[in-house]
Amino acid sequence: MISKTMKAILHALSYGNIELESSRRMADLKQLDAMRIFVKKLDVRVYNGEHEVPVRLYFPTEEAMQAGIVEGNTFPILLFFHGGGWVTESVENYDRVCARMAQATAHIVVSVEYRLAPEHKFPVPLEDCYAAAKALYTNQLILNTDPERITI
């Protein structure tokens, strides 16, 4: 038998009490950053079946951008999936984090804008992430990527 206290705790933590739209609006405020870091960025898309999955590429230098798009990549890559438990957040909310990671690590950062629940039930967000990883590993996102130099 579950105690009244435990029932109250479970009720408070249930998904029914999460205000998704309010949470998403608060997350959107994170992008209002006057100290935004300027790195080279490129928005592209990959496909999960018929669905286009937006992906943002962060290049630590102009040289990295040129190499990854035209000549063939020589930089290590970090494949990044933003937080939010498949329900909140976005690539835009993590823009500053990814830009700083690119600069601090001298890696190309690949950030995936996967679809969110509850509109898109699991495993749809995971499948969007897999589609981006597959495109990266098969050189569809960045030319001549060495799979041994990709960190997920």
Label for each model-derived stretch:
Residues 1-63:
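A glycine/proline-hinged amphipathic helix-loop "lid/cap" segment
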Residues 63-72:
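Intrinsically disordered, low-complexity Ser/Thr- and acidic-rich flexible linkers and loops
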Residues 91-111:
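Short amphipathic alpha-helix adjacent to the substrate-entry channel of hydrolases
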Residues 120-142:
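Alpha/beta-hydrolase active-site loop
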Residues 143-152:
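Alpha/beta-hydrolase fold nucleophile elbow
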